[in-house]
Amino acid sequence: MGKLEVIAHPLIQHKLSILRRTDTSTKAFRELVDEIAMLMGYEVLRDLPLEDVEIETPITKTIQKQIAGKKLAIVPILRAGIGMVDGLLSLVPAAKVGHIGMYRDEETLKPVEYLVKLPEDIDQRQIFVVDPMLATGGSAILAVDSLKKRGASHITFVCLVSAPEGVKALQEAHPDVDIFTAALDDHLNDHGYIVPGLGDAGDRLFGTK
């Protein structure tokens, strides 16, 4: 079973509390999502392999460490996942970015896929799927399904807020996928929203209804 890690760093929790507030502006919400994603990146990327490299300082030659030549890809689930991309890219700027577009049918609560645009060598990359919320788990499962159909095997899911129902569903569907979240909330309401949650992340990111 893939691991579930709740990143409880004080800075992340402080910023997440502001993110949740109803009176947080679109501008502030967007900035906070970016900042939290970057802060989470330190833990999400903790296990990247290192290799020795010889460098020359102003004083002498020395053997130091650098990230090994592991190919990375960040794949946001559109549209809200876009808000997390730059924060992670600031840490690993050489990573490629793919896109998986989905919308949720408000009657069935099921995700509908409308776009898949990925690097050609996605099957060779370590992939970080990003979406601010893991609610029912439907979108996350469908995104991982799409990636695995294209040969991907090393996949991690990164979100800001999650519900126990979504975590359980993703773990059952894809037990090899690790999940990183800034918060594990209480439950889903009758409309499939996370409680206490933060509302509709896409609408709050882009100022839409």
UniProtKB/Swiss-Prot annotation:
EC number: 2.4.2.9
Record: residues binding uracil: 194, 199-201
GO terms of molecular function: GTP binding; magnesium ion binding; uracil phosphoribosyltransferase activity
Activity modulation notes: Allosterically activated by GTP.
Organism placement in taxonomy: Bacteria, Bacillati, Bacillota, Bacilli, Lactobacillales
Organism: Streptococcus gordonii (strain Challis / ATCC 35105 / BCRC 15272 / CH1 / DL1 / V288)
List of residues binding 5-phospho-alpha-D-ribose 1-diphosphate: 79, 104, 131-139, 200
Name assigned to this protein: Uracil phosphoribosyltransferase
Catalytic function, reaction form: UMP + diphosphate = 5-phospho-alpha-D-ribose 1-diphosphate + uracil
Cofactor note: Binds 1 Mg(2+) ion per subunit. The magnesium is bound as Mg-PRPP.
An individual GO BP term: uracil salvage
NCBIfam families for the chain: PRK00129.1 (NF001097), upp (TIGR01091)
Cofactor section: Mg(2+)
Family, per entry: Belongs to the UPRTase family.
Stored InterPro entries: PRibTrfase_dom, PRTase-like, Upp_B, UPRTase/APRTase, Ura_phspho_trans
Annotated function: Catalyzes the conversion of uracil and 5-phospho-alpha-D-ribose 1-diphosphate (PRPP) to UMP and diphosphate.
CDD domains associated with the record: PRTases_typeI
PANTHER family per UniProt: ADENINE PHOSPHORIBOSYLTRANSFERASE, URACIL PHOSPHORIBOSYLTRANSFERASE, CHLOROPLASTIC
HAMAP family listed in its UniProt record: Upp_B
Broad enzyme group: transferase
UniProt pathway: Pyrimidine metabolism; UMP biosynthesis via salvage pathway; UMP from uracil: step 1/1
Keywords, in A-Z order: Allosteric enzyme, Glycosyltransferase, GTP-binding, Magnesium, Nucleotide-binding, Transferase
